[in-house]
């Protein structure tokens, strides 16, 4: 609970506040120490189709903000804030960002500014490329230096977050072949809150379903881009997403050919992650599970080698709404504002 107001507090707006990602951002902000001591103030809450409703109609768990009225998502409403989170479908953030001050910290949870290659963007999204911003996955090499003090942040996609954290240490150390396979299962909240037939309870409960396979999914080029950034070799990615009957969580199983021993691979992961507050490299013989990370900003990672098949296996579990979206957004905000990176974020899940 916020106890007092502080002069020159950082005023934060959330666009797309009625959606799952927007609601999760607000949940984390309500638990942020800067909110508790008044250094952070939650300003405008906006949405496109639910303007005029109260936030409590969409997120009854956010009781401190339940009475707040959702406003239209317009630059006139979002202007005047120190930081703006954009939790919007792709194609919407770029237009809004152009209308906001260069001094405003804009944290885009959509896809508009993630890809650096205009041709790749146009191929997968079918619209003009708006450019690229610093990538909000601090654990990647060099990412923190780009995020500190920036005023524009592109939050990674949820699947790429899991895949990149699972794979980059091995690839950066040149211990696996640069042709990787990623099979990732996800809860339905990753598809957003729109009412579609495929997400009805009767369609989801008791059923698992692959979708957008064979290089079609829009997160495929984002995974490849992130992996290419840590090696001087070209990287190919085969990505298969699978929807499972759960509300949250991603479990990514990533494989690649290797001739390196497990001891050498584990050493690469220990070197990459030993000082990372949100990464838990599991002991040998233990495997990640989504239930252990739900509600947290943690990523649980395990590595193994199938010696008969000469195949490296890395498994990562994250909460798609926290480390996969809102947690990465808040973590990146902390870095951009010069606050402790871990503020407002937990490594403790809520399992079972």
From Swiss-Prot:
PANTHER family: N-ACETYL-GAMMA-GLUTAMYL-PHOSPHATE REDUCTASE, CHLOROPLASTIC-RELATED, N-ACETYL-GAMMA-GLUTAMYL-PHOSPHATE REDUCTASE, CHLOROPLASTIC-RELATED-RELATED. It comes from Mycobacterium tuberculosis (strain ATCC 25618 / H37Rv). HAMAP family: ArgC_type1. InterPro entries: AGPR_AS, AGPR_type-1, NAD(P)-bd_dom_sf, NAGSA_dehydrogenase, Semialdehyde_DH_NAD-bd. Keywords: Amino-acid biosynthesis, Arginine biosynthesis, Cytoplasm, NADP, Oxidoreductase. GO terms for molecular function: N-acetyl-gamma-glutamyl-phosphate reductase activity; NAD binding; NADP+ binding. The keyword Transcription does not apply. It holds the Pfam family Semialdhyde_dhC_1. Belongs to the NAGSA dehydrogenase family. Type 1 subfamily. GO terms for cellular component: cytoplasm. SUPFAM superfamilies: Glyceraldehyde-3-phosphate dehydrogenase-like, C-terminal domain (SSF55347), NAD(P)-binding Rossmann-fold domains (SSF51735). It catalyses: N-acetyl-L-glutamate 5-semialdehyde + phosphate + NADP(+) = N-acetyl-L-glutamyl 5-phosphate + NADPH + H(+). The active site is at 158. Pathway: Amino-acid biosynthesis; L-arginine biosynthesis; N(2)-acetyl-L-ornithine from L-glutamate: step 3/4. This is N-acetyl-gamma-glutamyl-phosphate reductase. One of its GO terms (biological process) is L-arginine biosynthetic process. Its main location: cytoplasm. It is found in: Cytoplasm. Was identified as a high-confidence drug target. CDD domains: AGPR_1_actinobacAGPR_like, AGPR_1_C. Its EC number is 1.2.1.38. Catalyzes the NADPH-dependent reduction of N-acetyl-5-glutamyl phosphate to yield N-acetyl-L-glutamate 5-semialdehyde. The keyword Oxidoreductase applies.
